[in-house]
């Protein structure tokens, strides 16, 4: 399964985009411009997250994803804050998010998305079913 994120609009610290699965648009995305992931291909897995106490959609290498969570790193300028794994998760706005996460939902206005939980749950189930069937899930981020 290929999840494609096409970034379509950048203004200030807001980066908006469209999320497609196998070419079909599923929802909108929202990222913090200063901490968003670089364009490219990433492996996607489901890992039990210590921060959220449930399985989450983790982007990138997950071998020791939660072993050092949270780890202090310089993530925004010279500010030390807990750096959690980059993941796809529900949320309404990116202000204050400096962990490279991608929020999913329906675009409402600049920098805000609505109905994040239904969009996340739908995406989570599709990824879970593909991983259970032994298929590889890849995230492709494009500018």
Q: How would you name each of these model-derived features?
A:
Residues 1-137, 143:
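Cell wall/extracellular polymer interaction/catalysis modules
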